[in-house]
């Protein structure tokens, strides 16, 4: 069980899975940097930057639990407090396992693709009411490839820059990096194009 940085608990794991492991990175880069002691720290920095931007764990499907109070700014009460709209801290919610309001199980709900959960027939909810939601959220293997490729790109260029490399060629294609671009390369830093790639994964709900 892990309490994440995003206000919810991962209930089925003891450690948060990596988006991209060092072995996967070495395979994706044909072992170009294999044995470099900086790979682990660069992967960690890139992963931290990506997860901070998207606002959730961005990994394979994991069991999650999130707790709210009626006064929480991430929820909205409608129809006299008998219907709750909750912004779950996740994209790609694959299942809702259990919902309780003040200990009472609620079975009528609807989940939107952006992680907004609508819960009906909950009775009167006060500011101090406790809402507990157990759900599954995460990416399929195919969907996870974009984040893996982005991390590999970041770490590759960060390591290349630290070696003083200003141009590379592969498969007949040559790329030269501008001085300004090189100066701003960091594994944790996201460019505008990176943010476009991550847009489908970023938490953007009702609030």
Sequence positions of predicted segments:
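Divalent metal-cofactor coordination and adjacent catalytic microenvironments
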Residues: 1-207
């Amino acid at each position: 069980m892990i309490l994440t940085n995003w206000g919810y608990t991962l209930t089925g794991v003891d450690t948060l899975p990596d988006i991209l492991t060092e072995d996967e990175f070495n395979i994706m880069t044909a072992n170009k940097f294999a044995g470099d002691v900086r790979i682990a720290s660069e992967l960690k920095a890139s992963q931290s930057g990506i997860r901070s931007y998207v606002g959730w764990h961005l990994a394979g499907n994991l069991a999650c639990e999130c707790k709210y109070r009626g006064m929480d700014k991430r929820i909205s009460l409608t129809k006299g407090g008998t219907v709750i709209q909750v912004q779950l801290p996740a994209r790609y919610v694959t299942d809702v396992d259990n919902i309780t309001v003040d200990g009472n199980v609620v079975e009528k709900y609807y989940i939107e693709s952006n992680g907004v959960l609508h819960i009906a027939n909950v009775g009167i909810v006060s500011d101090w009411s406790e809402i507990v939601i157990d759900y599954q959220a995460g990416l399929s293997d195919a969907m996870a490839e974009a984040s893996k490729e982005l991390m590999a790109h970041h770490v590759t260029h960060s390591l290349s820059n630290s070696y003083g490399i200003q141009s590379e060629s592969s498969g007949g294609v040559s790329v030269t990096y501008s001085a300004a671009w090189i100066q701003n390369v960091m594994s944790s830093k996201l460019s505008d194009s990176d943010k476009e790639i991550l847009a489908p994964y970023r938490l953007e709900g009702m609030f």
